[in-house]
């Protein structure tokens, strides 16, 4: 039998009943929307709690029938046959509820900012950064998420030295947050005549997109500089100082945007800065909350080598969970579900172990 936090379950059920009652009173639209959002969040949890309590009652009734010496043989036999089936159903429901009751990452439902930077490997690394961006772009398309490039710096022979994009949709961050880290590629470059395998790398950073309500940026904490935006060969894109550099003085974080519109550059630079500051706060809170946890998947260390894409063998290996898939082509086409589900499952297991440890 799985250990479940009974007090918390009772509190959630009581809160759910209060929300139901308040929604029935037809308050104003703004209050109703907030209540409906909380209702939608609690509904699957409370439904599972109620189903489990009903199941406990059925199991108790069957156990009473089996232990009662006055029960006729046929009734006892039926109860003995049904009991293991209900116990199996109970275990499955307890495990489902255990996952539903896990601590939620406040950023999970948010959109994300994805930053991909070519690392070691020169032009090959830039090409690989391009492959990674297209992989995420296709994955996003399969889920009807919107992708918008914020800024890019193209490689000499293709791909990107750096590309930053927003991926908008519900729950984007929950699916992509484990992509942060160093991605390594092993393949034979087209220019390689000797057939030698080259190793290159690109770094991925996935940040939850932050709203103004999530993180406050005080005007006195930032310095905004404008400068000439230059195109290829150092030519000025236009005659105005359109590039914007924003420095967050307390942390030293610097964001540069160099598109043609100065107004748009300022807005986008603030958007990226807000996301980075929010991510720092989120990581700090996570570390304080679970200082004892050593989950590699959840660490988000961007210097950590997390995955290798081996072209000659057609395989992808995620080093954090020791998972190897021999479907490199499909993964690069955006078929990431198997990898992402395995990473989420591993993270949930680590959280469950942490909860057991605290209990």
From Swiss-Prot:
Modification N5-methylglutamine occurs at: 235
Cellular compartment(s): Cytoplasm
Post-translational modification note: Methylated by PrmC. Methylation increases the termination efficiency of RF1.
Region named Disordered: 284-308
Segment forming the signal sequence: none
Pfam family, one: RF-1
SUPFAM superfamilies named among the record's database cross-references: Release factor
GO MF annotation, one: translation release factor activity, codon specific
Family according to the record: Belongs to the prokaryotic/mitochondrial release factor family.
The protein, known as: Peptide chain release factor 1
Species for this entry: Bartonella henselae (strain ATCC 49882 / DSM 28221 / CCUG 30454 / Houston 1) (Rochalimaea henselae)
Lineage: Bacteria, Pseudomonadati, Pseudomonadota, Alphaproteobacteria, Hyphomicrobiales
Gene it is expressed from: prfA
């Amino acid at each position: 039998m799985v250990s479940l936090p009974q007090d918390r379950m009772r509190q959630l059920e009581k809160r759910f009943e209060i929300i139901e009652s308040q929604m029935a009173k037809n308050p104003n639209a703004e209050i109703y929307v907030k209540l409906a959002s909380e209702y939608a969040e609690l509904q699957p949890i409370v439904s599972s709690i109620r189903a489990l309590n009903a199941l406990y009652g059925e199991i108790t009734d069957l156990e009473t029938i089996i232990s009662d010496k006055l029960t006729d043989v046929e009734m006892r036999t039926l109860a003995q046959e049904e009991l293991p089936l209900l116990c199996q159903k109970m275990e499955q429901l307890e495990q489902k509820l255990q996952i539903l009751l896990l601590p939620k990452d406040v950023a999970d439902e948010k959109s994300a900012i994805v930053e991909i930077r070519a690392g070691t490997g020169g032009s090959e690394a830039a090409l690989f950064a391009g492959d990674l961006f297209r992989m995420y772009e296709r994955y996003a398309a399969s889920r009807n998420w919107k992708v918008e490039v914020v800024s890019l710096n193209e490689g000499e022979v293709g791909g990107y030295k750096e590309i930053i994009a927003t991926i908008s949709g519900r729950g984007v961050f929950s699916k992509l947050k484990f992509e942060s880290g160093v991605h390594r590629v092993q393949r034979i470059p087209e220019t390689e005549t000797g057939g030698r395998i080259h190793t290159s790398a690109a770094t991925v950073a996935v940040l939850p997109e932050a709203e103004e309500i999530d993180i406050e940026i005080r005007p006195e904490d930032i310095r905004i500089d404008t400068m000439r935006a230059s195109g290829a060969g150092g030519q000025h894109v236009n005659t105005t100082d359109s590039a914007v550099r924003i420095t967050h003085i307390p942390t030293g974080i610097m964001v540069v945007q160099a598109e043609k519109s100065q107004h748009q550059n300022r807005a986008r630079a603030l958007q990226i800065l807000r996301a980075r500051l929010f991510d720092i706060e989120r990581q700090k809170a996570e570390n304080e909350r679970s200082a004892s946890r050593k989950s590699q998947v959840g660490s988000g260390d961007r210097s950590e080598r997390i995955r290798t894409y081996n072209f000659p063998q057609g395989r992808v290996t995620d080093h954090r969970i020791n998972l190897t898939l021999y479907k490199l082509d499909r993964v690069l086409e955006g078929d990431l579900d198997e990898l992402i589900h395995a990473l989420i499952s591993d993270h949930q297991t680590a959280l469950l172990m942490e909860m057991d440890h605290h209990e």
